[in-house]
């Protein structure tokens, strides 16, 4: 089982890396790195080891920010100095905003929508992959923080006009008074689909509750991959030490429990 974090930070300062982590039966964490060359290495494509076929799903990792970013260590509270030194994170922790594009069963599915900043790379990268905004069939929302939905609306209009927008009902109910969420829901109108955990979703995508970072934070499984939103903000720290929370986690106790549950699930598989 492979896990993809939409706050795609890494354990090394490299330009536009893609990291997935596996956990083997002995609790040993290994990092697998894929770096694509071409078009500024902004897009990563992950497929099975046997080589892609015309019908084989493809998962593209798109880095929304055009340059590497670093989060200050202070966002994670009091981290012991010896741990900081051993992890070499005294100068901050690498971070990025990422969007996943899944090509499966003849459909194009996005997971979250990036931050929508002027320098966003989402639309240019989709264009390079051969897709216009109108080609996106569905968008699955992990949670409704601005850096995950900001790229879905522009000038009060949907950026992806043909897409169904799948939002976990627990998450949407928690943010009904937020102006940016109201704008999002109004823009997509009848294309907004509220769903509960356990509901059937397109292309066999499975939603799983991972509450804590936000009230209804949701992760998604597609085949042997997990797309886990903001379950972790700092892989370098939180993979081995999941009790550390970023300031962004709204309910620290639940966020820790969700992190540990995901890590345990991957370890079992």
Question: What are the roles of these predicted feature ranges?
Answer:
Residues 49-105:
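Zn-dependent metallo-beta-lactamase
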Residues 8-30:
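Short, Lys/Arg-enriched N-terminal segments with co-localized hydrophobic residues
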């Amino acid at each position: 089982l492979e896990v993809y974090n939409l706050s795609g930070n890494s354990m090394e300062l490299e330009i536009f890396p893609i990291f997935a982590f596996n956990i083997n039966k002995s609790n040993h964490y290994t990092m697998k790195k894929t770096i694509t060359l071409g078009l500024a290495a902004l897009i990563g494509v992950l497929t099975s080891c046997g080589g892609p076929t015309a019908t084989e799903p493809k998962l593209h990792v798109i880095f929304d920010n055009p340059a590497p970013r670093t989060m200050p260590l202070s966002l994670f509270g009091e981290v012991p100095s010896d741990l900081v030194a051993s992890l070499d994170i005294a100068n901050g922790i690498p971070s990025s905003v990422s969007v996943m594009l899944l090509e499966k069963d003849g459909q194009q599915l996005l997971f979250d929508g990036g931050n929508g900043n002027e320098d966003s790379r989402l639309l240019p990268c989709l264009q390079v992959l051969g897709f216009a905004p109108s080609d996106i069939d569905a968008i699955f929302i992990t949670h409704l923080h601005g850096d995950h939905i900001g790229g879905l609306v522009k000038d009060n209009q949907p950026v992806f006009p043909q897409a169904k927008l799948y939002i976990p009902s627990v998450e949407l109910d928690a943010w009904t008074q937020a102006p940016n969420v109201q704008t999002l829901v109004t823009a997509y109108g009848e294309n907004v689909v509220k769903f509960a955990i356990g509901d059937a979703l397109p292309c066999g995508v499975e939603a799983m509750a991972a509450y804590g970072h936000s009230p209804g934070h949701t992760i998604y499984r597609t085949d042997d991959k997990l797309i886990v939103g903001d379950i972790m903000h700092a892989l370098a720290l939180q993979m081995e030490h999941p009790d550390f929370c970023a300031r962004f986690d709204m309910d620290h106790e639940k966020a820790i429990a969700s992190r540990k549950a995901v890590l345990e699930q991957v370890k079992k598989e």
